[in-house]
A protein has these predicted regions:
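A short, structured active-site edge motif that brings together acidic residues
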Residues: 80-87, 92
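Short alpha-helical
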Residues: 37, 61-62, 87, 94
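Conserved beta-strand hairpin/beta-sheet module of binuclear metal-dependent hydrolase folds
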Residues: 1-49
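Active-site metal-binding loops of divalent metal-dependent hydrolases
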Residues: 33-35, 59, 84-85, 128-129
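Residues at the C-termini of beta-strands that transition into short coil/loop
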Residues: 14-16, 83, 126
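General small-molecule cofactor/ligand-binding pocket signal
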Residues: 11, 80, 122-125
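Active-site metal-binding motif and surrounding structural segment of the metallo-beta-lactamase
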Residues: 40-81
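Metallo-beta-lactamase
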Residues: 89-129
Length: 129
């Protein structure tokens, strides 16, 4: 019998509220870790699971904002993201400028530190991968 991994939802309690932002964990792969403002909750709720891979569906801060902080915390963590989003992970300045115009003074509370991701940690995906 073939065993298929089962995804586990991990509610990161954005702004202390449940069912707002949810990451998913599948055998140490974290799909969309959420914002950096929730990284401690994510880590606590993962329990003994140490993330080995982040798989990002896209780079919006509610899905991928914690990526740089998690890479700093877990030195072997690998990141998979579409090729269009990868440059914004390496240098998030344009993303932060755009988000700052939208969220203003609430930026830090909503999203936390958006840290750059070392380029060598990123594997880009394209097309239908």
């Amino acid at each position: 019998m073939v065993r298929h991994p089962v995804s586990r939802p991990v509610d990161v309690l954005h702004l202390g509220r449940d069912r707002v932002i949810c990451a998913y964990e599948i055998d140490g792969v974290i799909v969309d870790p959420g914002p950096a403002s929730c990284v401690e909750t994510l880590i606590d709720r993962l329990g003994p699971v140490e993330p080995r891979v982040l798989l990002l569906t896209h780079i919006h801060l509610d899905h991928a904002g914690a990526t740089g902080v998690l890479c700093r915390r877990y030195p072997k963590l690998k990141v998979y993201v579409h090729e269009v989003g990868a440059p914004h992970l390496v240098d998030p300045s344009k993303l932060l400028k755009s988000a700052g115009r939208l969220y203003g003074d609430a930026m830090w509370e909503l999203w936390g530190e958006v840290a750059p991701v070392p380029e060598e940690r990123i594997t880009t995906l394209s097309g239908g991968e």
